[in-house]
Amino acid sequence: MITVYSNGTAMIQAYADYLNTNPYLSQWFFVDGPLITKPDRQNYAVSAGTAAAPLLCVRVAPFSTVLFGDPDAAAELLDFLLAEDYEISRFLTSETVGDAAVRYLWERHGLRYQEALGMDFMEAREITEPSCDAVSAPESEDLPEIIECLENFILDCGLEDSVDEASQRETLSDFRILRADGKIASMAKLARRDAPFDTITNVYTRPEYRGHGYARKVVNNLKNEIVSAGKIASLTVDKKNPVSNRLYESLGFQRLFAQGEYRRV
């Protein structure tokens, strides 16, 4: 059964227990859901399937639609979204749901989607090496350089996102940076969650400083901060990037599952 919600919070409340069965996969529902207050074809919260086996989706423009739940409900959900002209040019979900959706979109609707970015979700629960004193939080005057690094990070990852300068200014203290030659050589950001885990995001090293262990020090410092606070450190890494995978594994991160962003081609 299809249900269109008047706001994202209503969906979260209706399926809170279900979403909490996998807080890693469902985290974007708690981030994006409250932002949906006036739903339309670009910003929406919709569910399909049954109460026991639903497939939930939320979208906040300009970001990807996020899917979570039972792949057997993919046909019902996708038929509705397409028939009602909802924006679904790209979506983020587990590989299980993603593969089912891609297959159905092609076989039933002749629409070709492909996994544009495959990611491994990893977590770490222990401190494995000491923090580096050279890693620090940025100052307000570092914001332009951080914005520059974020824009380069988006290009490197092949994402279609844009940088919201106001948002980054508000969360500037959550970044950690490591300098070399008077500029930011490497950085990462702490995304705080109302959950047992926090996430390390936006890990970026300037090309001329790669291969020298800068990212390792920044990520390790953030991991240590998270673990010391009694939480689990989590991150996602491109499955096609073996260098980063080995780096995170050497810091004690373990792979839990795979997810991907799928785009229409």
Over which residues does each language-model region extend?
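Conserved beta-strand-loop-alpha-helix junction that forms the acyl-donor binding cleft
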Residues: 92-98, 235-247, 261-265
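Short amphipathic alpha-helix that is part of the acyltransferase structural core
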Residues: 1-27, 124-160
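Conserved donor-binding loop and adjoining core beta-sheet/short helix segment
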Residues: 3-4, 23, 30-84, 90, ...
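Conserved acetyl-CoA-binding loop-helix of GNAT-fold acetyltransferases
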Residues: 72-79, 205, 211-227, 245-250
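Acyl-donor-binding surface of acyltransferase catalytic domains
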Residues: 61-132, 262
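Conserved active-site tyrosine of GNAT-family acetyltransferases
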Residues: 101, 248, 253
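Residue-level detector of high-confidence beta-strand sites
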Residues: 187, 256-258
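A conserved beta-strand-loop-helix scaffold within acyl/acetyltransferase catalytic domains
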Residues: 33-34, 60-61, 165-204
